[in-house]
Regions:
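Membrane-proximal alpha-helical anchors
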Residues: 75-77, 84, 114-207
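N-terminal leader/targeting and pre-domain segments
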Residues: 164-167, 175-195, 199-202, 206-243, ...
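Short hydrophobic membrane-inserting helices
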Residues: 1-139
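Short amphipathic alpha-helical segments, especially helix-boundary/capping motifs
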Residues: 158, 263-266
Length: 722
């Protein structure tokens, strides 16, 4: 940033001379005085002609003309550009003498030009002398001010010149230090020389940022960014011994081979030489990381540091040493993509105002990103982790974790706008519990080789878990899905979806459950479980289906419990095979129910082991239906029939008018609550309304329990009547 050459003093004076006359005349105190003086002189000359007594005679006309000419000449002479623009002492004396002589002549001759009988001649002469003296005083003051202005201008010019020379010298010296520091940083022999170069460069960045002589802050940043780029480039540069990180991190060489004595000594000596060089380079690079890290932290938590305005590019780096960037604050984009971390990587409690790129990286040890805030996009896709902690983080735009591999991962308690975890592999446990997804959540096509926990999460828009494999069980208990949720085509060892709320559609079709599956106590708008296989027990007990429920074309190899549930719309069970015990007791089917052929299934259901249970003799629970127009046709060639009495399963009844009206009102209120939830999505009020829905569903469950419980007194009366 070199300074431009300034015009010298002579050029400046030459350029300004043509303006000085105007500047001189524009000074109101001087030009005004001259004009007033000339006006007074004009009045004095004209007064004798204008007076009533007509005091002037023809003999004095020449004298008056003389005095008038003298006054005009004096005025012109005082305003002569040569005199006005002159800085020399003789012209000031000329102005003073001209004024004095002119005033004296007027004081002497003007009274003569007036009749001798005129009174006040002495006063007139006295006034002229006073006016002349005042004019001389004004000229003196003007000259003094002019000299002061000239001196001040010269001093300012000198100061500016000295300041510019000093700044030019300082910046030149900085660039010399920068060049030398770069040479030191490239020294291959001594780590101490490289370390000196690091600290010099760090100090130069601080100096540029603190240089207030550079008015624009962005210009200071530009100078500092050049140095930051060099420091980042050094971190990115390859180091030959990095590939021996594991061996050189040990205190001594470990080898099972037996060598001859001299060979063993050579190997040991070479090991300690390499270890010393390795550790020296680690120290140099750690010093760079530490100096950057210290300046990325503000005085308070989550506040910017002195270097937070820079961009950092560590892409493609191999960190063969621990990396600590905790509590860092980045205002600009930061790039760590395609990097390899051989030691621990700690990025927790950091704030990223710009985009954060970590994709395509490999973490050989732990990676900690917990408690961080990403105000723009964050890309962690295609990475490999041993263990990774992203818990308690906030992603205000998009977050991409797709195609990654984790030994174990913790994403619990985080908040996402739009999140993509698709196509990832979790080799041990994965925890996503207690998280909030404000926009779409894409977790399809993932593989969970260990346990997975999604418990208590909220999905404010769509959530897609389709085509995933859970080899050791997964927990989705107590979650809320405010738009459609897709779990279709997945494979589960065991799965727990109990106590969840699905505001729109829930698709579990075409899935396989190798062991148990628990959907108990959930609330669905509409639900599709068709074409699924349950190799172990499955529990749908105590659920509420506000829309259609489709269980058609499924296979149940173990027990299937549908008891204690409420179906507001149609329920489809056709084309399914039930190989174990099936329980529908204590349920309410408000609309039609289909076990035979229908639009969803071309075949009827088949109960191969025993007939389904619609009446629980032990707990005295029956099933209530809202319509006679149901289809209980099942395949009796391969299984058991449904026992019927008057087109109704044995010991079951129709809803009475009072029960129907109650349910109609309940369903109407639940619909209103659902609409409120959709309207308040994303607000604090939303959680309260969700809790209201849970409480309302609890009341419905309690009412259903009472309504489906058969009172023993009534049974006894019926037996006596029969």
């Amino acid at each position: 940033m070199s300074d431009k050459k300034q015009p010298n003093a002579e050029q400046h004076e030459k350029q300004s001379k043509q303006h000085k006359v105007c500047l001189w005349i524009k000074r109101w105190w001087f030009s005004g005085t001259i004009l007033v003086g000339l006006a007074i002189a004009f009045l004095i000359i004209c007064l004798p002609y204008l007076s009533p007594e007509h005091r002037i005679t023809n003999d004095h006309t020449v004298l008056l003309w003389y005095l008038g000419s003298l006054a005009v000449t004096c005025g012109l002479f005082l305003c002569l550009p040569k005199i006005v623009t002159s800085n020399t002492k003789k012209y000031f004396i000329t102005r003073v003498l001209t004024t004095g002589i002119t005033g004296g002549v007027f004081a002497l001759l003007l009274p003569i030009a007036v009749k001798s009988t005129t009174t006040g001649v002495g006063g007139l002469r006295h006034s002229i002398l006073l006016a002349t003296g005042g004019l001389l005083a004004i000229l003196t003051l003007g000259e003094t001010r002019r000299k002061n202005d000239i001196d001040k201008h010269k001093n300012d010019q000198e100061k500016d010149k000295n300041d510019k020379d000093y700044r030019r010298q300082v910046r030149a010296e900085r660039r010399e230090r920068y060049t030398k520091a770069i040479e030191q940083l490239g020294d291959d022999e001594k780590a101490s020389v490289r370390m000196g170069g690091v600290y010099t460069l760090v100090g130069l960045v601080d100096e540029w940022l603190e240089d207030e002589s550079i008015e624009k802050y962005k210009d200071r940043l530009k100078e500092g960014q050049v140095i930051i780029n060099n420091l980042c480039a050094y971190i990115r540069s390859p180091f030959t011994l990095a590939s021996q990180h594991g061996k050189l991190s040990q205190n001594k060489i470990k080898s099972k081979n037996k060598f001859k004595k001299f060979i063993r000594k050579y190997i040991q000596r070479n090991f300690y030489i390499n270890k010393a060089n390795f550790q020296a380079e680690v120290d140099v690079r750690l010093s760079i990381i530490k100096e950057i890290h210290d300046r990325l932290k503000g005085p308070e938590e989550n506040t910017p540091g002195a270097w937070s305005d820079f961009e950092y590019d560590f892409s493609g780096s191999t960190f063969f040493y621990p990396v600590d960037f905790t509590n860092s604050y980045y205002k600009k984009p930061v790039n760590f993509r395609n990097s390899t971390y051989l030691g621990r990587a700690d990025f927790k409690d950091s704030t990223y105002e710009g985009r954060a790129y970590f994709r395509g990286s490999t973490y050989k040890a732990g990676a900690d990103f917990k408690g961080s805030i990403y105000q723009e996009g964050a890309n962690f896709s295609g990475s490999v982790y041993q263990w990774a902690n992203f818990s308690g983080s906030t992603y205000q735009e998009w977050a991409n974790f797709s195609g990654s591999t984790y030994q174990w991962a913790d994403f619990s308690g985080s908040v996402y706008q739009w999140a993509n975890f698709s196509g990832s592999t979790y080799q041990e446990w994965a925890d996503f519990s207690g998280s909030t997804y404000k926009a779409g959540a894409d977790l399809r096509g993932s593989t969970y080789q260990g346990r997975a926990n999604f418990r208590g999460s909220t999905y404010q828009e769509w959530a897609d878990f389709s085509g995933s494999t859970y080899q050791k069980g997964v927990n989705f208990r107590g979650s809320t899905y405010q738009e459609w949720a897709n779990f279709s085509g997945s494979v589960y060892q065991w799965a727990d979806f109990s106590g969840s709320i699905y505001q729109e559609g829930a698709n579990f079709s075409g899935s396989i459950y190798q062991e148990g599956a628990n959907f108990r106590g959930s609330v669905y708008q509409w639900a599709n479980f068709s074409g699924s296989t349950y190799q172990g027990r499955v529990n749908f007990r105590g659920s509420t289906y506000q829309g259609r429920a489709n269980f058609s074309g499924s296979t149940y190899q173990g027990r299937a419990n549908f008891s204690g549930s409420t179906y507001q719309r149609r329920a489809y069970f056709g084309g399914s095979t039930y190989q174990g015990q099936v329980n529908f007791s204590g349920s309410i089917f408000y609309s039609k129910t289909y076990f035979g052929k229908d639009g969803h299934s071309k075949t009827s259901s088949c109960f191969t082991n025993r007939s389904p249970q619609f009446y629980d003799e032990t707990n005295h629970k029956n099933t209530l239906f809202g319509s006679y127009n149901n289809d209980f046709t099942v395949d009796t060639n391969k299984g058991y029939p449904i026992g019927l009495n008057k087109d109704m399963p044995l010991d079951c009844e129709l809803l009475n008018p009072g029960q129907k009206n109650y349910l109609k009102g309940v369903f109407h209120e639940m619909k209103k609550i659902n609409n409120k939830i959709l309207e308040t999505k994303g607000s604090k009020e939303n959680a309260e309304i969700l809790e209201e829905l849970r409480n309302f569903n609890k009341e419905l469950h309690e009412w259903r329990e009472e309504a489906t419980t058969v009172k023993m007194e009534d049974v006894a009366v019926e037996d006596m009547e029969s």
